[in-house]
């Protein structure tokens, strides 16, 4: 793993410059950066989103989808903020940003699987947080961001990455070595570096870098632990990042949850799968 010690990234790994990773949509990044500012005004968020008409249109479309299921459809960004709240808007804009970042690559089945896994992880993280004590908006946002390194590798080298995913089988962790062999970096390392390069909130760095590391038995329940379980639940619920992904049995995943979350969460993988699929489908057809 990379060490966040202030070294020049090219000095850490000379292949970083070679990757030539494309920038993330500016508006989505700015919304996420503003989210950490307690003094931000709602009109600032509205003006920022509205400054990019295509982005604003996509935000409104998804805001009115089954993903958020508002009681009253929003016809403007101001209304969307009023209906959904500023906190939900952060995760929504990041979701729109990820979809825009992948662009036409989403037409490829392997890329669509990566996208669906990412969104499934975010939705599961949101649900787990809703029955526990962690912040739902932060959990959803962390879920969307957890595989940002994988998304970046997929976008910059789509053909090679699809071939890698198609040929690989094993645990989600085992693919990291295959990525390092091909790119010089794995998606956790790339994600950690992008948190810095894109000036994202630094508290997401350990989540992005360590989301494949399961919680130890005596460790407290935390956001990184929630994302780790959510990521594997996404695989089990029918949204694996690659076809040969090793699946953890759902009862085993439930056993990893704290008592409160375990008692209030979906008792069967079938009910979880149906709900997640319905919400993702609503975004894809929006």
Please tell me what each predicted stretch does:
Residues 1-12, 218, 253-286:
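Terminal helices and disordered tails flanking the catalytic cores of nucleotide-processing hydrolases
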Residues 1-169, 173-248, 285:
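Conserved alpha-helical "signature site"
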């Amino acid at each position: 793993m990379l060490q966040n010690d202030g070294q020049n990234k090219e000095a850490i790994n000379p292949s970083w410059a070679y990757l030539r990773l494309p920038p993330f949509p500016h508006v989505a990044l700015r919304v996420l950066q503003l989210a950490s500012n307690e003094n931000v005004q709602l009109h600032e968020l509205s003006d920022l989103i509205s400054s990019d008409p295509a982005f604003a249109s996509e935000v409104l479309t998804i805001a009115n989808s089954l993903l958020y299921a508002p009681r009253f459809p929003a016809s403007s960004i101001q209304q969307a903020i009023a209906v959904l709240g500023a906190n939900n808007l952060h995760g929504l804009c990041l979701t729109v940003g990820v979809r825009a970042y992948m662009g036409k690559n989403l037409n490829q089945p392997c890329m669509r699987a990566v996208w669906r896994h990412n969104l499934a992880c975010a939705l599961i993280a949101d649900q787990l947080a809703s029955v526990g004590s962690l912040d739902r908006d932060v959990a959803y946002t962390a879920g969307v961001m957890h595989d940002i390194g994988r998304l970046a590798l997929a976008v910059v080298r789509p053909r090679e990455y699809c071939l890698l995913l198609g040929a690989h089988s094993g645990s989600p962790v085992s693919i990291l070595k295959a990525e390092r062999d091909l790119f010089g970096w794995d998606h956790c390392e790339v994600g950690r570096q992008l948190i810095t390069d894109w000036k994202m909130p630094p508290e997401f760095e350990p989540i992005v870098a360590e989301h494949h590391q399961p919680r130890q038995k005596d460790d407290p329940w935390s956001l990184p632990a929630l994302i780790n379980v959510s990521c594997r639940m996404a695989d089990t619920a029918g949204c694996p990042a690659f076809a040969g992904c090793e699946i953890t049995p759902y009862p085993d995943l439930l056993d990893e949850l704290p008592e409160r979350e375990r008692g209030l969460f979906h008792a069967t993988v079938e009910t979880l799968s149906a709900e997640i699929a319905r919400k993702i489908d609503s975004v894809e057809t929006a």
